[in-house]
């Protein structure tokens, strides 16, 4: 099939798929290179242009959440530093200084259209701890009800490397899951995802539409892939993470005229990463496996370990010999083999640590007696909410 015809077919599929979305809530993520004109300070002209597009969506009743990088780069400029600092304390200080300018600029750009904006700085702990996750979700929901536009960024001033999201692509995907977004738009300095590096290969073709879980995307964008690193790998990973909540992702150049409104209207610009029900389960398991902080541990006997690892079964309370830590229902915990001490899986637990202790080593028919009548929970960790780590 000729490349031109193939591209036309892909564009038609893109438009058809995009127009099937009922888009009421959108996450827009803008990276540092775009926001700061490749590190030369905040590009206010570009920011005001994106604000104009966001205002058009806002006027149509579409709720927009913005994930904005650029605090460290702006801090470097404001402090007249010759280069980006390497020491953690200096980087955190730059983030503190630059965040002021970042939020100030977004506020000024949006208020001219009558849009109130707010600042929300998050850490990995805020989203890995269930109670803080729910509190954050509640605050975001209230802001949206008030028609306030949240501007979200990682709290680089207090975050250490070991518990960083690593990039705002990931943070945007997690925000999409928090608020059940209908679309996640990642604005970048590339037109989309290509089959090869277009700078080196004139025959490289942009991928207009693909499943977020398609393995070959990692081959293209991975560390050893054709495109090298270049940031595209994290964007594809973020697309997979957004797929966990059923949210499609568009990766597209932020330099395209009216790019945000054109994407939301269903125009074929950039690369659309789609999802389906099976992809949600696969992406969810990957998200669980990537969790940095565990809220507690479930120590399991050999029989339960075999059921989980070899037969991909749910973890039943009868196989749990010990509960460690203080956690709530819905928190992510590790599952550890009692004989080897090895972590075999991580998963989202259906019981608080208090109730887990009460039902550990007990059979299902005893739950009503232990926890009260009409107890519906029968598994400690469901297999769909469990990811193997060995």
Swiss-Prot record:
Substrate binds at residues 69, 156, 168. It is found in: Cytoplasm. ATP binds at residues 29, 188-189. It comes from the Bacteria. Keywords: Amino-acid biosynthesis, ATP-binding, Cytoplasm, Kinase, Nucleotide-binding, Proline biosynthesis, Transferase. Pfam families: AA_kinase (PF00696), PUA (PF01472). GO terms for molecular function: ATP binding; glutamate 5-kinase activity; RNA binding. This is Glutamate 5-kinase. It comes from Psychrobacter cryohalolentis (strain ATCC BAA-1226 / DSM 17306 / VKM B-2378 / K5).
């Amino acid at each position: 099939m000729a490349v031109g015809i193939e591209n036309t077919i892909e564009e038609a599929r893109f438009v058809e798929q995009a127009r099937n979305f009922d888009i009421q809530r959108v996450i827009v993520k803008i990276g540092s290179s775009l926001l700061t004109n490749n590190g030369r300070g905040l590009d206010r002209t570009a920011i005001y242009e994106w604000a104009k597009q966001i205002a058009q969506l806002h006027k149509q009743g579409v709720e927009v959440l913005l994930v904005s990088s650029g605090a460290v780069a702006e801090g470097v400029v404001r402090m007249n530093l010759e280069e980006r600092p390497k020491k953690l304390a200096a980087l955190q200080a730059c983030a503190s200084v630059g965040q002021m300018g970042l939020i100030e600029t977004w506020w000024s750009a949006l208020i001219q259209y009558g849009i109130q904006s707010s600042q929300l700085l998050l850490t990995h702990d805020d989203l890995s701890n269930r109670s803080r996750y729910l509190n954050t979700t509640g605050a975001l929901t209230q802001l949206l009800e008030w028609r306030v536009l949240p501007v979200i960024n990682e709290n680089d001033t207090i975050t250490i490397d070991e518990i960083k999201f690593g990039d705002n692509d990931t943070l945007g995907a997690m925000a999409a899951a928090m608020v059940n977004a209908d679309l996640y738009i990642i604005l970048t300095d590339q037109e989309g995802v290509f089959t090869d590096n277009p700078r080196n290969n004139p025959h490289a073709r942009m991928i207009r539409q693909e499943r977020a879980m398609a393995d070959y995307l990692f081959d293209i964008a991975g560390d050893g892939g054709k495109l090298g690193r270049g940031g595209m790998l994290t964007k594809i990973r973020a697309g997979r993470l957004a797929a966990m909540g059923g949210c499609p992702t568009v990766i597209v150049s932020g330099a395209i005229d009216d790019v945000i409104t054109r994407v939301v209207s269903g125009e074929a610009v950039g690369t659309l990463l789609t999802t389906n029900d099976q992809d949600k389960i696969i992406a969810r398991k990957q998200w669980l496996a990537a969790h940095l902080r565990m809220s507690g541990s479930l120590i399991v006997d050999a029989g339960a370990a075999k059921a989980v690892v070899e037969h991909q079964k749910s973890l039943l309370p009868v196989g749990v010999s010990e509960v460690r830590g203080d956690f709530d229902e819905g928190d992510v915990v590790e599952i550890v083999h009692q004989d080897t001490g090895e972590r075999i899986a991580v998963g989202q637990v259906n019981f608080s640590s208090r109730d887990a202790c009460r039902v550990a080593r007990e059979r299902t028919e005893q739950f009503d007696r232990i926890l009260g009548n009409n107890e519906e929970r029968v598994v400690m960790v469901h297999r769909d909410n469990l990811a193997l780590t060995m």
